[in-house]
Amino acid sequence: MERNSRIDSSGDLTQSADEDCFLDAPLLPSQKLQSVIRPHFHPVPTVCISILLALINLAYVTLAVVAFYFCLFSGKKKECNQSVAPFNLSTVLVISKLILWLLHVVNERFAHHHHCKAKNKGFLHLYRSTRHLKGLPLIIHSTGNAALLLILSVQDSISSNRQLYPCLILSVLLLELILSVICLIIYTVRIYRFNKRKPRPDIIEEEKINAYEGHVNPEIGFRHRASLEEVVEKQGDTIEYLKHHNALLSKQLLALTSNQD
């Protein structure tokens, strides 16, 4: 009994000494803690790229219409062929269309990268609401490429009708332009409004709304008008964000503590 009491007393002394060490440790400045817990807002830098891509789409279709008019309908076919030599007009059009499609691929990958970063920072609603929208222009142009290849493959079959071939190509290009520019404008407006609002992560915004309204947000659990897949997806994204945020917060706190030492 006496030995056990000595062990307990020594354990208590060790525990109290450890607690004193924690109490004597220097406190982190509140400004540094606030900067870690509430990081600065970083806008999604895809607005200018989307606007530039829409202008490139418009310029491409405009030049295609002008080229078809002067090469096929204005009687200046010889001068037009000399200006695009050693290629013909169809080859130049296909090469330009391929370059435009590659620009859409780069834009989609660029937007996807920054949307994943926004998702990791807690902007889950933005990621879900633009998940399909940011890739629609690429899908539209990929479908247009398939349509152009089909038209080019049957070019010899419709060579008897001189005006049908360019009209089909221009119809595909104009339809591509209208649909892709509409998607780009909707996406650009949505991202611009998001950057202008400078919101905090979704979880913090929901907590603020709950504290203001005084009741639990039903989206945390089950919503009557929400499907089970939406609820599971949202909860999974929330858990993933919390794990990422906790890991990042732990690293930053350890770095600040080591700097204090």
Curated annotation (Swiss-Prot):
It is found in: Lysosome membrane; Late endosome. Keywords: Endosome, Lysosome, Membrane, Transmembrane, Transmembrane helix. The chain crosses the membrane at residues 51-71, 86-106, 135-155, 167-187. The keyword Membrane applies. It holds the Pfam family TMEM192. One of its GO terms (cellular component) is lysosomal membrane. It is a multi-pass membrane protein. Coiled coil: none annotated. InterPro entries: TMEM192. Homodimer. Belongs to the TMEM192 family. This is Transmembrane protein 192. It comes from Xenopus laevis.
